[in-house]
Amino acid sequence: MVFDEKVFNQRVGKAVLEHISSLLGPTSVKVINLYLKRYDTDLRLICEDPQKVSDALHIVFEDGAAFLEKKIARAAYEIFNLTPNESDSLRDAIERLRNLAEDLE
């Protein structure tokens, strides 16, 4: 079986939205995405450009971005039933998961 990046991106993006919605509520997620759209990104695009999402979160939420990034990374790790590495940046977490998914295929 060949690694399907599109499917990976969709699964992780969906899981991130569901997890963050369960923590903060769907209205909060809509507000976060509205702010992120100002920077031409969205939580659903976390796998396509995690650094862009991270940068936008830091611009919008400043110190609160670290909290959101940890929650987003945790949601992504839960897809693979992995324990999150708390020291991972958001980009590192997505890259680690992408590598794992490629190895599993």
Walk through the language-model features, giving the residues of each.
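Long, compositionally biased intrinsically disordered regulatory segments in eukaryotic proteins
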Residues: 1-105
